[in-house]
């Protein structure tokens, strides 16, 4: 309940109070009526599930989306992203990137491969083409979740240029 400063786990409920231990270990007491009047997020579904969801989008520069061509395909095979017969020069580089990203996520030891794994385009925007990475991490503990998620995205950021793609970045007051 953000308005009440309550963001954590309910520790005790009585007729007149609800005691919440926040994630920073502070204790907040709110009335039961506050829970009825305001919205709140119930984390129990995530805690009881087989994974914690990651849904993050990265904007790609439209000017760098194009058919892969022979040279890019050869480079992707040479770097081990694909086998020689898997890709053709007329396939768009973003398509190849999405295919590889899904395969990478499905094989990552921290990703729950029995749950949904999807790398897909969202509605184009002025900031570029948003591509959403949607998957579930097996380790739901906050610190491990954050580190595992960041490790995955740092790798995604690092390999983007290998596919001839560029992440959109808005430059204000300086040259690109």
What would you call each of these model-derived segments?
Residues 1-88, 95:
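Soluble accessory domains appended to multi-pass membrane transport proteins
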Residues 78-176:
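Long, non-transmembrane cytosolic or organellar matrix-exposed soluble domains/tails
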């Amino acid at each position: 309940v953000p308005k009440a400063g309550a963001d954590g786990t309910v520790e005790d409920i009585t007729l007149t109070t609800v005691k919440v231990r926040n994630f920073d270990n502070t204790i907040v007491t709110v009335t039961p009526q506050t829970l009825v009047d305001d919205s709140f997020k119930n984390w129990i579904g995530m805690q009881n599930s087989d994974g914690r969801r990651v849904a993050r989008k990265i904007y790609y520069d439209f000017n760098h989306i194009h058919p892969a061509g022979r040279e890019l395909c050869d480079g992707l095979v040479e770097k081990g992203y694909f086998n020689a017969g898997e890709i053709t020069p007329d396939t768009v580089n973003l398509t190849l990137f999405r295919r590889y990203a899904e395969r990478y996520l499905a094989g990552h030891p921290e990703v729950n491969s029995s749950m949904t794994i999807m790398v897909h385009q969202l509605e184009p925007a002025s900031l570029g083409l948003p591509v959403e990475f949607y998957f579930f991490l097996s380790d739901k503990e906050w610190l491990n979740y954050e580190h595992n998620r960041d490790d995955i995205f740092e790798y995604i950021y690092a390999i983007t240029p290998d596919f001839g793609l560029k992440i959109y970045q808005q430059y204000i007051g300086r040259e690109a």
